[in-house]
Amino acid sequence: MENKAMYLHATVSDRDSSSIFEEPFDGRSLSKLNLCEDGPCHKGRAGGCCTQLGSLSALKHAVLGLYLLVFLILVGIFILAVSRPRSSPDDLKALTRNVNRLNESFRDLQLRLLQAPLQGELSEQVWKAHDALQNQSDSLLALAGAVQRLEGALWGLQAQAAQSEQAVVLLRERAAQQSDAAQLELYQLQVDSNRSQLLLRRHAGLLDGLARRVGALSDELADVGGALRGLNLSLSYDVALQGTRLRDLRVLVSNASEDARRLRLAHRGLELQLKQELAVLNGVTEDLRLKDWEHSIALRNITLAKGPPGPKGDPGDAGKEGEPGIPGLPGLRGLPGERGTPGLPGPKGDEGKLGATGPMGMRGFKGDRGPKGEKGEKGDRTVDASGVEAVMVRLVNGSGLHQGRVEVYHERRWGTVCDDGWDKKDGDVVCRMLGFPGAEDVHRTAQFGQGTGRIWMDDVACKGTEESIFRCSFSKWGVTNCGHAEDAGVTCKRH
């Protein structure tokens, strides 16, 4: 009995020192509480061996060992439940029910042992305890299986927890990467924002400068507008002044044309008078030639001989005061003065209306024919016009009448001819005017000396068939660009 009890105690002690996860609980070992199983009195339960082994102390030790074992199991279960995360709720509930059932069974067993009599039906109580322990061993086996399943579930939960931790680590790394990327993007956004602010400030400065320039330009435009208005006023005044001067010039030109017409009429009268005098002179000359041919030849030789210069004559009387000349043209406009301060703009004047152009006057009616005049007296012998024109041309400073510097008579004074375009055709016309058959040679560049006074003719272009040099084409009377160093001359052919 004591040996069996010691064996049971040792078994319980070994199970206490070992882990319930290393060696599962075997409830069949409690069957050793059958005290008559190994003894010599195994076959008879009412003998003396059973009575010797029916000690209550062994039963008490067994019950205490069983309580201790159950306590250790409960402690291990609670440690696992506390240390392992998230166990299965169904397994925990089943385990709790089994433990509660086991506790109730042990309590009933303890009460029965304490209330059982010491002498009466001890063997029956032992066998009942044996049966109860047998049943409790089955329950413990089921409880051990549940604990093993719970342990497997805990190991699975642990593996899942490790995977979850790895996933959490990966998530943390990814979160850290995302945080770094977000910080980098935030930094870039800040840099872009700073750049945008700088650009906005720069653009604002440019806009301010542009606004100032526009303001200055508007002021300059206003000044230019004022200057243009002043210039317009001055130009309008100048235009009006020029219009007045033009009207005055028109009046002067009309007066000059009237004077020219009068002079032309007077010139025609003088020309007629001169022709008459020349006719008289020719008649006298012809008479002289007829009366005394020798005297005429002597007289011609005398006229051709150049005598010594006569004494200087007395100064003539002062002529009459001439008419006032035409007012001269206005001088060039002076340089503009310094720019004055712009004055206040005056009120805008009313725009004047353009005057209507006067109607052109009607042509006057043809006058009545005057009465027929009385028959005049018989006139003197006429002279050929070529002879008159011949008197208006002469050759000067030559070795004879056939050569010299060509001079023409115009406006009661003698003048020279420029050698521009002067050729033999021109010389032929001049020589025929003087009674010679033609020109032997023409001369330029004042070969017979420089004349004095006006240069009446320039750019003379004769065809060679004209009767007078005055019928050749030339520039206007007195219009020339030559000097007396270009006076023309001619040498005529003799008979």
Swiss-Prot record:
Q: Which domain of life is it from?
A: Eukaryota
Question: Do the record's keywords include Cell membrane?
Answer: yes
The residue ranges crossing the membrane are: 62-82
A Pfam family annotated for this chain is: Collagen
| First-listed, main subcellular location of the protein, grouped into a coarse class | membrane
Composition bias type Low complexity, residue spans: 324-342
Q: Show the GO cellular component annotation of the record.
A: cell surface; plasma membrane
Function (record text): Ferritin receptor that mediates non-transferrin-dependent delivery of iron. Mediates cellular uptake of ferritin-bound iron by stimulating ferritin endocytosis from the cell surface with consequent iron delivery within the cell. Delivery of iron to cells by ferritin is required for the development of specific cell types, suggesting the existence of cell type-specific mechanisms of iron traffic in organogenesis, which alternatively utilize transferrin or non-transferrin iron delivery pathways. Ferritin mediates iron uptake in capsule cells of the developing kidney.
Q: What is this protein called?
A: Scavenger receptor class A member 5
